[in-house]
Each structure stands twice: as C-alpha cells, then as structure tokens.
Amino acid sequence: MTNLNYQQTHFVMSAPDIRHLPSDTGIEVAFAGRSNAGKSSALNTLTNQKSLARTSKTPGRTQLINLFEVADGKRLVDLPGYGYAEVPEEMKRKWQRALGEYLEKRQSLQGLVVLMDIRHPLKDLDQQMIEWAVDSNIAVLVLLTKADKLASGARKAQLNMVREAVLAFNGDVQVETFSSLKKQGVDKLRQKLDTWFSEMQPVEETQDGE
C-alpha cells in the first residue's frame, strides 16, 4: 500500500456535471455531505492546506464538482453539498441528479467519503448517498464530523449508534469520528484513502469491440 503525500494535493478543475469531467481513468475518491457537514474543512485538514477547498459561510454555495489531484491518476472529488433548505427545489433536484449520475456511472470511482455532523447523522439524503454507493458496489467511509462538539461518552454513543444503523445497507460501510479542529480521525481517513488509491482498477474496455 502506497502512503501518499496529501499535502501535494492541488486543484485541477470544476465541472457542472459528469459530462464535463476529465476522462474516466485512474482512481477517484469522492467526498459528499450535507452543506453544513464540514466537507471543505475536512479536505483542508486532510491535505494540511488552509484553503484548498473553499469554505463558505453560506451553505449550498458549492454547486460544482471540484477535482483535486493527489498524485498522477489519483484524484479527490468534492461533490456539491446537499440538503440546504433555502436552495430552490429545481436546483436541489439538479444537484441530486448530478450526484446520482456520478456515483452510478463514474468507472474510476473507488470509494466514497460521506460526511455527517455527529449531532445530526443519517439524514434522508445521507442514507440515499450510501444506498447509491452500495448499489454501485462502491465502498463507503462515513465520517462523523465536528466530533469535538460532544463529550467523550456522547461521542462513543453516536459512533456505536451509526455503526449499528449502517449494517442495514449490507455493504462495505465503515464509520469513524472526525474533527477538523482537533485533527481527530485524520490518520484513519488517510489510511482508508491510501488503501483505495492502491487498489487495482479493472482493465478499460476498448471501443468498437477491439
């Protein structure tokens, strides 16, 4: 297993939907979460960069798929935040279509990190993201963010509750606590990413039956 240097991660491009992404080769790991789950902060903590992923005081502002390259052919994908109440319904549907299309069709997608506020985990859209991933045979790491907001006992109780709940998905779903502020859970996140980035990809199909 390769230990990648996530501090070398750099922004590549933004895309409004899957059709505007670069060629479907290499390995991608996607980050998804509700608009206030701390996704941008987690990416910045992972890479030890203060502004790699733009954090916003306005939830729902990140409407694009953002790609970051860790190493040649190895990318992190920041998916649009979902579930923000004040976003118009039409825009919500558009985001959900883009998310579902990416999870179902992107061949280079190796793993999905779903971030949830530890105080409010497993909302409907969180569960839908996990379900989409499991249905597409994609491994999932659930990060219960803002873990520093709870005392140790409450933190463990939430962790155990979510671990029990995700068994119902019958998929490869791991759950860990995470705090960008305290740098808690960063090592486990890096270990999981290293594993996913080290896995062999299936041989690409040739065109025209060649």
From Swiss-Prot:
GTP binds at residues 33-40, 60-64, 78-81, 145-148, 178-180. The keyword DNA damage does not apply. GO terms for cellular component: cytosol. The keyword Cell cycle applies. Residues 25-199 form the EngB-type G domain. It holds the Pfam family MMR_HSR1. SUPFAM superfamilies: P-loop containing nucleoside triphosphate hydrolases. Mg(2+) binds at S40, T62. GO terms for biological process: division septum assembly. Necessary for normal cell division and for the maintenance of normal septation. Depletion of this protein leads to a severe reduction in growth rate and to extensive filamentation, with a block beyond the stage of segregation. Essential for bacteria survival. This is Probable GTP-binding protein EngB. It comes from Escherichia coli (strain K12). The lineage of its organism: Bacteria, Pseudomonadati, Pseudomonadota, Gammaproteobacteria, Enterobacterales. The gene is engB.
